[in-house]
Each structure stands twice: as C-alpha cells, then as structure tokens.
C-alpha cells in the first residue's frame, strides 16, 4: 500500500480544500518556509488514521484541528481529511482486498461529532485501526517518525519497545484476534451461567408444583 493523495479541508491552517498528490514510485518531499504548513500535512495524515492523543497533533484540545479563522477567512465548521491509498496487491483485510484504491476519511464538527469512513461508507474507529493493523501505517505505527521519536524509542520502557517490534513483526493482528476471542468466550461463559441459573429456578418451580 502506498499513499496516492491526501485531501484536506478546514484542518488547522488549511482553510480551503487542498489536494496533494504523491508519487507512486520514488520519494515525495514536501518543502517550504517555516510556518507554511508542512508539519500540518503530517498531522493530517496522523489524524485521519485515528490519532486520539491531542499532544501528538500539537494542540490543546481536539477542536484545535479545526481551522480557527484569520483576518481574511471565517472559522471552519468542521475539519475533514481524506487519505487515498493504492492497493494493487490487496495488502489489506479481506473485505477490502479487491479494491485497487482505499480512501479513509475523518470528519470532526465543532459540536464534537466525529465521523469515519472507508470508501465513503461510515465505519468505526476500530474498523480504521483494523484496516491498517500490522502495516505500520496507523496513527501510532512506526511509519510516522517525527522529531524526537528515535530518542523516545531508545529511552522507552521494554514493554513499549515490545509493542513497536510486535507491530513491525506482524503479530499484532493475531494478538488482537486472540483477545477478541477470549472476550467472546468470557461473555459466552457468563451467558451460560445465567441460562443455568434460569433453568435451575424453573426446575425448582416445577418441583414445587409437583
């Protein structure tokens, strides 16, 4: 999977819709003077992939990602970012493997309402994270390395490094499936206990009538 383009509207300094195209071969470099919004492009990518930690978006609250207005432009009512990936080899979950392109969209309104979409279909944040599981692309993945990140990894705790290594090794998906299965098993066990209690109560009532 490779990033094909990113569409940004009302996000941070992007008051007007902007569509950035990325080369499918080689390296794309975003250049410009200080304060022109280069870091906001990276923030937009991280945000649309499900980043929930405001400090990693360089803001005080999540609403800070919505364009706040300027001397010449009114504040935006929402922020929207859409990130399109080329998927020629079907390197995704089976339900999206047949798509040659996958577009992930995130919207945030000033009311606090948040919307996620995959190929224009509303989904949950969980679905977005599962889509990129084991690819390193997610908001907390190893594909986005900002200033100071290498130092953080070197000085991080063993458990934190283990999480990063597991992601790179491609075993996060299997751990997630195991945890999901264990949770369902626990729920099924609890339901079975409740059914057993109900059957026991009914049996006692039946014996009382006899």
Predicted regions and their residues:
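Gly/Lys-enriched N-terminal cap/neck module of very large, oligomeric protein machines
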Residues: 2-210
């Amino acid at each position: 999977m490779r990033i094909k383009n990113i569409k940004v509207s009302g996000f941070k300094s992007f008051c007007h819709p902007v569509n950035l195209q990325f080369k499918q071969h080689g390296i794309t470099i975003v250049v410009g003077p200080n304060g022109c919004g280069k870091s906001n492009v990276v923030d937009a990518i991280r945000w649309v992939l499900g980043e929930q930690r405001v400090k990693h978006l360089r803001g005080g609250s999540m609403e800070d990602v919505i364009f706040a207005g300027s001397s010449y432009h009114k504040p935006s009512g929402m922020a929207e970012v859409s990130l399109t990936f080329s998927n020629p080899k079907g390197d995704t979950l089976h339900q999206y493997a047949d798509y040659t392109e996958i577009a992930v969209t995130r919207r945030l309104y000033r009311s606090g309402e948040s919307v996620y979409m995959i190929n224009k279909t509303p989904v949950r944040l969980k679905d977005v994270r599962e889509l990129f599981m084991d690819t390193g692309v997610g908001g907390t993945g190893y594909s986005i390395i900002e200033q100071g990140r290498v130092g953080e990894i070197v000085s991080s705790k063993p458990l934190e490094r283990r999480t990063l290594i597991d992601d790179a090794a491609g075993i996060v998906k299997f751990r997630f499936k195991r945890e999901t299965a264990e949770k369902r098993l626990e729920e099924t066990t609890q339901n079975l206990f409740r059914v057993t209690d109900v059957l026991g109560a009914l049996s006692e009532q039946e014996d009382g009538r006899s």
